[in-house]
Swiss-Prot record:
Protein name as annotated: Toxin Tst1
Domain topic, free-text comment: Has the structural arrangement of an alpha-helix connected to antiparallel beta-sheets by disulfide bonds (CS-alpha/beta).
Tissue: Expressed by the venom gland.
Cellular localisation: Secreted
Cysteine amide, modified sites: 81
């Protein structure tokens, strides 16, 4: 039983460490990175360029998984898009 608990704990820890964060990529103005008129696969490429594991076009913006902590993702609370 103790072994099973230890095994499950290790799996959860691996998911936390390896999983990374997820969210919408931001452009240089702090807005979500648009994929509205981009070709298929654009968001996946952009996400992997940022060292993410994968990504897709969550119309109309790129959403990424497995991003490292240094990558800034869009957050409603700190949204600066269109504001000066």
């Amino acid at each position: 039983m103790k072994g099973m608990i230890l095994f499950i704990s290790c799996l959860l820890l691996i998911d936390i460490v390896v999983g990374g964060k997820e969210g919408y990529l931001m452009d240089h103005e702090g807005c979500k990175l648009s994929c509205f008129i981009r070709p298929s696969g654009y968001c996946g490429r952009e996400c992997t360029l940022k060292k993410g594991s994968s990504g897709y076009c969550a119309w109309p913006a790129c959403y990424c998984y497995g991003l490292p902590n240094w990558v800034k993702v869009w957050d409603r609370a700190t949204n600066k898009c269109g504001k000066k």
